[in-house]
UniProtKB/Swiss-Prot annotation:
Its cofactor is Mg(2+); Zn(2+). The keyword Transit peptide does not apply. It catalyses: RNA(n) + a ribonucleoside 5'-triphosphate = RNA(n+1) + diphosphate. It is an enzyme of class 2 (transferase). CDD domains: RNAP_beta'_C, RNAP_beta'_N. Keywords: DNA-directed RNA polymerase, Magnesium, Metal-binding, Nucleotidyltransferase, Transcription, Transferase, Zinc. This is DNA-directed RNA polymerase subunit beta'. The gene is rpoC. One of its GO terms (molecular function) is DNA binding.
Length: 1165
């Protein structure tokens, strides 16, 4: 049985006139839409019921047949078929044109396909199509040549000279005749010959032409189909006309455009019937051509057709393009039923896997379930009365709702959803009021706060959806970030403050040194005010060891005892194998935010997520309870200004006076003076800050808040009670007058004014950053969306070599971090003892990584997606661990999207500023987000470094006019490089350099690295450089995410010599397809093709995908579709995006084809 939704691929091509007529249910002959009196569609008009179907269900136009019983009858009076009105969404019509017109996409696109086929310039073609010149179709026995362009005058002269011996024409008819005469096979052979013979521009043109010719040859499209005889009319429901209040009508722009075409077409028919003079007919044909152009792509040629208010009308192309177009608005993102949204409030009483759902919202969301249960329980007789009960909100309904909700998870989402933790599943708990309640620990993942944020709720309906929500999306199972595998559900703010307060130790507190027989006794003493939480006390601890109860007195505080009650005592902070330490508390230290992170991390590793979820809730309760009990508040007197501040300021002012004197005497330059002043004030600011921190009491609330990591940092305290310090002006240059005051003392007007630059720049920066970061994420998702783990092991023996990533001498990312959770290529052997630390094929754990670093190993060869041999997607062994679980990655994991989200999500944190290095004419070094974009788009960087193309010895020569570096290799080959003024040279005279080494400072062009040092070098370079940017901002991202993107950038090869294969010279081909073609050629004893790896930027790479649906929905929709139609492309539907567009399950996770045939059966208990 053929099912419409069950297909494996989708093909796009040019439509032949026959095909268009076959789609159509009738010809639209009149430009009328609806009758202004009856408001019924006009017959043969754009909304005609006879062509497109009835407007009302089961009712013909004249009203002779009404009701469903006449289904399928065609009315004998009005000719309308009695059927459902929704056929008006799918039935098409057509317009028979009186003269053929060209399709603007194929004539005007870049490159002009029609022009390439006919070997004519687009300008000449435009003249012919728009009736400004003649073209010779058949020169006969005359000296004219075929396809020669004749002006009006030349044509008349030739007519006089040669009479009827030759044929020339104008307009689309002439072009169609020329297209029909083309013999593609002959032309293809000719062009291949020409490519072998010619060089330069001629060869490039021939290659371009061959591409178009081959596209037509292989797709079975005929060139003359680029000229339209008949135009399809899309269904009326897709270009609706609706009545507004006040009796006016609003109509889709397409109707206006169609109307113009029909009017002009009818006028042309009439003129032809009347036998009007040629010049009038020609003008009308030109106008018809322009009307059709406007309908297909308004504004592509000449001035766009405008509607009322000078607004360009939206043509068929505009309906597909952009964010509001069909692809992105309706196919990739749809609004869904069973959803609601509301403001969020905090729910500290909830468990981590729960959320509070307002009662009225829950009732509406679960309405069908409630109705069914009411009927099943016999509370209502039928569904209709159940619906009434729910609508009247009877008391029984609430009890039923409670039961329905019990085992039914809901999804909560907060916009913007930057990574997959932006949607998580929770078990709903009914709450009064109209706000959603959110657990405080999941706020970090959502980046939510309670200052008025809203969130959306969605209900998973099917059994499978509920199972996925429960097992994969439940918040308790998502405690780790997919970016770097660190915990994301870490207590913040009050909870941190509470834990800090609870575990702090106070010397000389009340009851210090008292001894208690048990913890209970200590708690009693505390309740009676005998001791404080922070007093040092001794308590006898009891533990059962090997079945024997032992005890020992330990020194600690009551707070720490209480805190440890919540914490498992086997996390590994204390070495329990040591008999002296059996009784020690697991957490016997001051707990701030970082310590909490460590506790949770260890708990997940030791006990797994379920136990950790319980631990998190316990810490949350303790934190809230004791931050309330501690009652830590801020008063203005807590900002204690250090006494030494005045002294430091005075000293610095004296220092600056000296500097200014030196400058006035001409001993130092202005630049040096400026730098010294800045350095002096920076030092003063740091000294004051240090004095301030040392001056604050350990129990000062401000100090506690910042030390524990609950809120605020040193920098903010410095501004409150130290000195505000130096400010930057609008260009980012530091102003040399610092703000000496702090907020406690108050600023002078001048100081306040200086500080406004920075404040505003911050806001402007943030707004720009958000947009840029979102666009970067979108491009990353598009380039990597079809990377899915497709198999367990691809069996490759290749890998990449990893070392510490360094920037100068500073280690940015350590080796251990880079190898945890990866598979080694071979055995990793201890260099001295020769013992095997990790066998090949076993994942490197944290402990292994420690051993490797201890053994002094500096380089490790690991498997990587960069060298993975899976044809589509990657394999689990090359990818390594799934960071969100720490286990091996499952087949079906959508690692491409995870990679894109992991790189895109922190994008907003990266700074925008391109900052100036001091010194003479310092190059701008791009940093932050623009640098990441520059790398991923593989652009030529700003501040380009010159690199050596050969290995050899350096000689630097400086003359008055120029600096030059000459590199001489051992075999006498030399290369010389001119050094622009202001560049800093990195090498010195007589140095040995390798090919690809930098000669001057700056960023290297990745394309040069690929050319000189090869593929592995450019991969390493890109990964390292992106890591540098993120690590500078303190953002940790695992290498594998960047590797996934880089793999996609290097997927293609550029064919240099096609040999005897069917590949086209200069074409971009997938690496795997290329290897396959060559293997085929070699097997047949033919000459294989030669190609070079191509490095594409992410936008280019996303558009170069095999899937035209994915590319068209990304950018440049018309260009992608034009090309795809000519090539007759088939979309194999392997990626995620294409499947979303056509409405199938995505081929990842349980949607993979290998799981498709599994049937689900319900087990009744």
């Amino acid at each position: 049985m053929f099912e419409l939704n069950n297909f494996d691929s989708i093909r796009i091509g040019l439509a032949s006139p026959e095909k268009i007529r076959e789609w159509s249910r009738g010809e639209v002959k009149k430009p009328e839409t609806i009758n202004y009196r009856t408001l019924k569609p006009e017959r043969d008009g754009l909304f005609c019921e006879r062509i497109f179907g009835p407007q009302k269900d089961w009712e013909c136009h004249c009203g002779k047949y009404k009701r469903i019983r006449y289904k399928g009858i065609v009315c004998d009076r009005c000719g309308v078929e009695v059927t459902r009105s929704k056929v008006r969404r799918e039935r098409m019509g057509h317009i028979e044109l009186a003269a053929p017109v060209s399709h603007i996409w194929y004539f005007k696109g870049i490159p002009s396909r029609m022009g390439l086929l006919l070997d004519m310039s687009p300008r000449a073609l435009e003249k012919i199509l728009y009736f400004a010149a003649y073209v010779v179709i058949d020169p006969g026995q005359t000296p004219l040549s075929k396809k020669q362009i004749l002006s009006e005058k030349e044509y008349r002269d030739s007519l006089e000279k040669f009479g009827p011996k030759f044929r020339a024409g104008m307009g689309a008819e002439a072009v169609r005749e020329l297209l029909q005469e083309i013999n593609l096979d002959e032309l293809s052979a000719e062009l291949r010959e020409e490519i072998k013979q010619s060089t330069g521009q001629k060869r490039v043109r021939a290659i371009k032409r061959l591409e178009v010719v081959e596209a037509f040859r292989q797709s079975q499209n005929k060139p003359e189909w680029m000229i339209l005889d008949v135009i399809p009319v899309i269904p009326p429901e897709l270009r609706p006309m609706v009545q507004l209040d006040g009796g006016r009508f609003a109509t889709s722009d397409l109707n206006d455009l169609y109307r113009r075409v029909i009017n002009r077409n009818n006028r042309l028919k009439r003129l032809l019937d009347l036998g009007a003079p040629d010049i009038i007919v020609r003008n009308e044909k030109r106008m018809l051509q322009e009307a059709v152009d406007a309908l297909i792509d308004n504004g592509r040629r000449g001035r766009p057709v405008t509607g009322p208010g000078n607004r360009p009308l939206k043509s068929l192309s505009d309906m597909l393009k952009g964010k509001q177009g069909r692809f992105r608005q309706n196919l990739l993102g749809k609004r869904v039923d069973y959803s609601g949204r509301s403001v969020i409030v905090v729910g500290p009483e909830l468990k981590i896997y729960q959320c509070g759902l307002p009662k009225e919202m829950a009732l509406e969301l679960f309405k069908p379930f409630v109705m069914k249960k009411l009927v099943n329980d016999g509370l209502a007789h039928n569904i209709k009365s159940a619906k009434r009960m729910v609508e009247r909100v009877r008391n029984e309904v609430w009890d039923v709702l409670e039961e329905v909700i019990k085992e039914h998870p809901v999804l909560l989402n907060r916009a913007p959803t930057l990574h997959r933790l932006g949607i998580q599943a929770f078990e709903p708990v009914l709450v009064e009021g109209r706000a959603l309640k959110l657990h405080p620990l999941v706020c970090t993942a959502y980046n939510a706060d309670f200052d008025g944020d809203q969130m959306a709720v969605h209900v998973p309906l099917s059994a499978e959806a509920q199972a996925e929500a429960r097992f994969l999306m439940l918040s308790a199972n998502n405690l780790l970030k997919p970016q770097d595998g660190k915990p994301v559900a870490v207590p913040t703010q009050d909870m941190v403050l509470g834990s800090y307060y609870l575990t702090i130790l106070k010397e000389g507190a009340k009851g210090e040194g008292r001894v208690f027989t048990s913890m209970d006794e200590a708690v009693m003493a505390y309740d009676n005010g005998e001791i404080e939480l922070h007093s040092k006390i001794k308590v006898r601890m009891k533990r059962v060891v090997d079945g024997v109860e032992k005890s020992k007195i330990i020194e600690t505080t009551l707070g720490r005892l209480i805190f440890n009650e919540a914490i498992p005592q086997d996390l590994g902070f204390v070495d329990r194998s040591d008999p002296d330490k059996i009784f020690d508390l697991e957490v016997d230290f001051l707990v701030g935010k970082n310590e909490l992170k460590k506790i949770i991390d260890k708990s997940i590793k030791v006990h797994g997520t379920t136990k950790t979820a319980i631990l998190l809730d316990k810490i949350k309760e303790l934190g809230f309870k004791y931050s309330t009990k501690g009652a830590i508040t801020i008063s203005i007197s807590d900002m204690v200004i250090p006494e030494v501040k005045a002294k430091y300021i005075k000293e610095t002012e004296e220092k600056i006076e000296k500097i200014t004197k030196q400058y006035k005497r001409g001993l130092i330059s202005d630049e040096e003076r400026y730098n010294s002043v800045i350095a002096a004030w920076t030092e003063a600011s740091e000294n004051i800050t240090r004095a301030l921190i040392n001056n604050l009491d350990r129990f000062n609330p401000v100090y506690m808040m910042s030390q524990s990591g609950a809120r605020g940092n040193i920098n903010q305290i410095k501004q409150l009670a130290g000195m505000r310090g130096l400010m930057a002006d609008t260009s980012g240059k530091t102003i040399e007058f610092p703000i000496k005051a702090n907020f406690r003392e108050g600023l002078t007007v001048m100081e306040f004014f200086i500080s406004t630059h920075g404040a505003r720049k911050g806001l402007a920066d943030t707004a720009l950053r958000t947009a840029d970061s979102g666009y970067l994420t979108r491009r990353l998702v598009d380039v990597s969306q079809d990377v899915i783990v497709r198999e367990t092991d691809c069996g490759t023996r290749k890998g990449i070599e990893v070392t510490d990533i360094k920037d100068g001498n500073e280690v940015i990312e350590e080796l251990s971090e880079r190898i945890i959770g990866r598979y080694p290529v071979g055995n990793i052997v201890h260099p001295e003892t020769g013992e095997i630390i990790v066998e090949a094929g076993r994942m490197i754990t944290d402990q292994d990584a420690e051993k490797i670093v201890k053994a002094g190993i500096k380089k490790v060869r690991i498997r990587s997606v960069l060298t993975c041999h899976s044809e589509y997607g990657v394999c689990a062994k090359c990818y390594g661990a799934n960071l969100a679980t720490g286990e091996e990655c499952n087949v079906g994991e959508a690692v491409g999207i995870i990679a894109a989200q992991s790189i895109g999500e922190p994008g907003t944190q990266l700074t925008m500023r391109t900052f100036h290095t001091g010194g003479v004419a310092g190059e701008d070094i791009t940093q932050g987000l623009p640098r990441v974009e520059e790398l991923f788009e593989a652009r030529k960087p700003k501040g380009l470094a010159i690199i050596s193309e050969i290995k050899g010895t350096v000689k630097i020569s400086e003359t008055k006019k120029k600096r030059e570096i000459v590199v001489t290799s051992e075999d006498g080959e030399t290369r010389s490089y001119l050094i622009p003024y202001g560049s800093r040279i990195k090498v010195s005279d007589g140095d040995q350099v390798e090919a690809g080494d930098e000669l001057t400072e700056g960023s290297v062009n990745p394309h040069d690295i690929l050319k000189i040092k090869g593929v592995e070098a450019v991969q390493t370079y890109l990964v390292h450089e992106v890591q540098k940017v993120y690590r500078m901002q303190g953002v940790d991202i695992n290498d594998k995410h960047i590797e996934v993107i880089v793999r996609q950038m290097l997927r293609k090869v550029k064919v240099e010599d096609p040999g005897d294969t069917s590949l086209l010279p200069g074409g971009l081909v997938d690496v795997f397809d290329f290897e396959e073609e060559n293997a085929k050629a070699i097997a047949e004893g033919k000459k294989p093709a030669v190609a070079k790896r191509a490095l594409l930027g992410i936008t280019k790479a996303a558009l170069a995908t095999d899937s035209f649906l994915s590319a068209a929905s990304f950018q440049e929709t018309t260009r992608v579709l034009t090309e795809a139609a000519i090539k007759g492309k088939v979309d194999p539907l392997v990626g995620l995006k294409e499947n979303v567009i056509i409405g199938k399950l995505i081929p990842a996770g349980t949607g993979m084809s290998r799981y498709k045939d599994i049937t689900i059966s319900t087990v009744t208990e």
